[in-house]
């Protein structure tokens, strides 16, 4: 965890970014890099405090490299600790220094896909009490005091139980953190100004897959044999539902490097990637969101998650008068 720096803004750092605090809640290691890697790298580079909370260690993931197959849950069951290290590598690539696991590393276990027996095993995140899990996140919210929260939609983007549960826990914690009557021992109340869900506009996905199909038709151009489908992309919605578009083209390399750090789960061949199913899909450097709580300035798409939220002056930071 890193405090706000005490020196002046770095060259090129917009003054308004100083004092901005972004909290992201994800289900497993790798979700943050796939969904928000460019966003995280951009805001971290611009001087915002970026905090990631990951809810499980991703113990039930499928392992891609044959040399690491022994990590799988049906063999050594050591994938979780290995993915902790992968996540640390990804955070380094994104320039993010504040990462926590919900309730501490290993407090909640990956639940596996919907309908499998792992959903109900002791400690599975899917079977956790939402208020109990949310209390762990309330502690983080009241400590970090983020103006912006990013998480999944109610379906978790694609129906994975841990993603759905992460949504429930994040939204519940956002409400409880602002309630002065809830657990005063967890810190002073804090009301998050803006809450976003991860989204991808259908038009962008269709365009990306059309480009992918053309590239697949040229032998040797793409190292993957087959394309995924639009339904394999989490959070795809009609274009009009997207309220916010973060241009991360300047951080595309950082996002790709962070995804590569999750080598047990992702294969990257820019501008495409594949998961354990080996089905290629576009790697997007521009990332999209739907504002579900908070004020939106004007009717056009936002280009900044902190739009309408002032930063703090350098003098305030030096004097210690800012939160």
Curated annotation (Swiss-Prot):
It catalyses: 1D-myo-inositol 2-acetamido-2-deoxy-alpha-D-glucopyranoside + H2O = 1D-myo-inositol 2-amino-2-deoxy-alpha-D-glucopyranoside + acetate. Binds 1 zinc ion per subunit. Zn(2+) binds at residues 28, 31, 163. Coiled coil: none annotated. One of its GO terms (biological process) is mycothiol biosynthetic process. Its cofactor is Zn(2+). One of its GO terms (molecular function) is N-acetylglucosaminylinositol deacetylase activity. Pfam families: PIG-L. Its EC number is 3.5.1.103. InterPro entries: GlcNAc_PI_deacetylase-related, LmbE-like_dom_sf, Mycothiol_biosynthesis_MshB. NCBIfam families: mycothiol_MshB. Belongs to the MshB deacetylase family. This is 1D-myo-inositol 2-acetamido-2-deoxy-alpha-D-glucopyranoside deacetylase. It comes from Streptomyces scabiei (strain 87.22). The gene is mshB.
């Amino acid at each position: 965890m890193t405090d706000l720096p005490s020196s002046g803004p770095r060259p090129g750092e917009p003054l308004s970014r100083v004092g901005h605090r972004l909290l992201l809640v994800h289900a497993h290691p790798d979700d943050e890099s796939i969904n928000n890697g460019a966003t995280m790298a951009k805001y971290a580079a611009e001087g915002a405090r970026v905090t990631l909370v990951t809810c499980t260690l991703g113990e039930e993931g499928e392992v891609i490299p044959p040399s690491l197959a022994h990590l799988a849950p049906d063999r050594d069951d050591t994938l979780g600790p290995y993915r902790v290290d992968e996540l640390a590598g990804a955070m380094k690539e994104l320039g993010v220094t504040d990462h926590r696991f919900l309730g501490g590393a290993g407090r909640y276990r990956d639940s596996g896909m919907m309908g499998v027996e792992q959903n109900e095993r002791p400690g599975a995140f899917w079977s956790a009490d939402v208020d109990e899990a949310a209390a762990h996140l309330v502690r983080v919210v009241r400590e970090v005091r983020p103006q912006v929260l990013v998480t999944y939609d109610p379906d978790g983007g694609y129906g994975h139980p841990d993603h759905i549960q992460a949504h429930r826990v994040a939204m519940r914690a956002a409400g409880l953190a602002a309630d002065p009557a809830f657990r005063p021992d967890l810190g002073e109340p804090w009301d998050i100004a803006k809450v976003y869900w991860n989204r991808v506009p259908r038009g962008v996905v269709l365009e990306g897959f059309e480009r992918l199909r053309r590239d697949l038709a040229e032998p040797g151009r793409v190292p993957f044999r087959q394309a995924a489908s639009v339904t394999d992309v989490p959070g795809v919605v009609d274009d009009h539902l997207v309220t916010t578009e973060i241009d991360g083209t300047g951080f595309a390399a950082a996002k790709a490097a962070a995804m590569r750090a999750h080598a047990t789960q992702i294969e990257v061949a820019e501008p495409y990637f594949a998961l354990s199913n080996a089905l290629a899909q576009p790697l997007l450097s521009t990332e999209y969101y739907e504002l579900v709580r908070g004020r939106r300035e004007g009717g056009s798409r936002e280009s900044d998650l902190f739009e309408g939220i002032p930063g703090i002056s350098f003098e305030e930071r030096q004097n210690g008068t800012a939160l």
